[in-house]
UniProtKB/Swiss-Prot annotation:
Main location as per UniProt: plastid
Name of the gene: rps3
Residue span, KH type-2 domain: 47-118
UniProt name for this protein: Small ribosomal subunit protein uS3c
Organism: Nicotiana tomentosiformis (Tobacco)
Subcellular location: Plastid, Chloroplast
Length: 218
């Protein structure tokens, strides 16, 4: 059986960049890592609570964290930043104060910026949220997959593969279903591939969604 490595880690340094940029002493490294995870979770929870969207898509593509001695710079890449800004005009300031309270940044300044990504449905995280929303609303998984592929075609991608695993459509026996459109060269290191795995809780149990999107060849 072919073993699948995580496509993002496999391409680190060639087509993929790091989402956290900072240095620390080896003894403080684990603290910094946990802090990053907490910041990401805190932002996702805040967005979930304060954004009421019809499609159920929060639209966070990724969160980049850059740290200096006196500053934590957080950049949120979103597909639909309007939703956050319109639903809460002072949303970003609120989020900033919430994070500062959480991490009691006394000697460090916290700065949050929101950046819009050009083609939201060319991003696997946003697409996975879309599919998860469809599955929660009991739409058939094949319909959800086909709709997702239609959305990526508008975003000029070279290829996409979607895999859903678990008790699909509430069947007693769990199975894995997948669909591929276009090319997805996972073995080519210079191929720019974006990937995400997403867990969705339905009334029948947990489903796992994996999405590979082939964007471009370097």
């Amino acid at each position: 059986m072919g073993q699948k490595i995580n496509p993002l880690g496999f391409r680190l340094g060639t087509t993929q960049g790091h989402h956290s940029l900072w240095f620390s002493q080896p003894k403080n490294y684990s603290e910094g890592l946990q802090e990053d995870q907490k910041i990401r979770d805190c932002i996702k929870n805040y967005v979930q609570k304060n954004m009421r969207t019809s499609s159920g898509v929060e639209g966070i593509a990724r969160i980049e964290i850059k740290k200096r001695i006196d500053l934590i710079q957080v950049i949120i890449f979103m597909g639909f930043p309007k939703l956050l800004i319109e639903s809460r005009p002072r949303g970003i300031e609120e989020l900033q104060t919430t994070l500062q309270k959480e991490f009691n940044c006394v000697n460090r300044k916290l700065n949050i910026a929101v950046t819009r990504i050009a083609k939201p449905y060319g991003n696997p995280n946003i697409l996975a949220e879309f599919i998860a929303g469809q599955l929660k609303n009991r739409v058939s998984f094949r319909k959800a997959m086909k709709k997702a592929i239609e959305l990526t075609e508008q975003a000029d991608t070279k290829g996409i593969q979607i895999q859903i695993a678990g008790r699909i459509d509430g069947k007693e026996i769990a199975r894995v279903e997948w669909i591929r459109e276009g090319r997805v060269p996972l073995q080519t290191i210079r191929a720019k591939i974006d990937y995400c795995s997403y867990t969705v809780r339905t009334i029948y149990g947990v489903l796992g969604i994996k999405i590979w999107i082939f964007l471009d060849q370097e």
